[in-house]
Amino acid sequence: SIGGTAGVYSLDRMRYGFTMNSGRLTITQSTDTPNGFANSLKVDITTAESSLNASSGAAIGQFIEGQDVQQFKKGTSDAEQYTLSFHVKSSVAGTYPLWFGIYGLSGGSTYYYWTNYTINSADTWEKKVITVKKQYFGIIKHS
C-alpha cells in the first residue's frame, strides 16, 4: 500500500509520484493487457483520499535519457515532430490530463508539454496517440 507524499519506482522504469493525506493505492503488474502485450501496470485505489486540496495529485511517469531522444533534433533548424503513444484502461471514461517534461535542456532549462486525452469507454483498452509539433528551441543534452 502506497500513500503520503513521495515518488516511487514501480514496474520497469515506471515511476509513480503522488501527494495524498489519507489515500492509499497499490501498483501491480497485471496480465490484463491490450492485444500484443504480456503485462501492464495496474493502479488500484484501495482507500480514496478523504479531502482533496490544491496540492493533491498523482502521476505516472517514465524517465527517458537524452541519448534516446536525439532523433527529435529538438532545438535545431531540423527539429522533427514526435509522437507519444500508449494504451490506457480505466473504470471511468472521461478526459484526463497528460504532461511531460524534458529536463536538462541546453542552458539548464526545462520544457513542459501539456494536453488532454479522452478515455471513450470504461473498462476497455484504448490506444492513445499524441503528436508534438516541431520544437526549434532547447537542445536536448546527449546523456
Residue positions per predicted region:
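Extracellular and organelle-lumenal recognition/adhesion modules and their flexible linkers in secreted
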Residues: 1-143
